[in-house]
Amino acid sequence: MKNKVVVGVTQRVDKIDIYGEWRDALDQRLVDWVVEAGFIMVPIPNVLVDVSLSNDSQPNLDIWLNTINIDALLLSGGNDIGSVPQRDVTERYLLRWAAKNSK
C-alpha cells in the first residue's frame, strides 16, 4: 500500500471576544477538499513561532516540522498580511523551510 502524502496546512487566526481567546482555524471545506484529494491533512499551529526571533530561527516550529515530517505545504486563506504578525512569521518561515527542504 502506497503511503499518502502528508500536507501541512496553515491556519488563520480568529479572535473570539466572547471567550477572550485567539484561535487558529481552518474552513472545514478546505479540510474536506484536501482529504477528498487523497492527502493526509495536518494543521500547522501559529503559536509555535516567536515573533521576536528572526525569520531564520524558529526552533519550536523546526521541532514540529521534523516530528510531523510533512511532504507538502498549503498556505490557506485568511487574515490580511500584517494584521496577525504571528501568522505572517509562520508563513514566511514555512516558505523558506519548504524551499530548503523540497523533495
PLM regions: where:
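N-terminal beta1-alpha1 cap of cysteine-dependent amidohydrolase-like domains
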Residues: 1-103
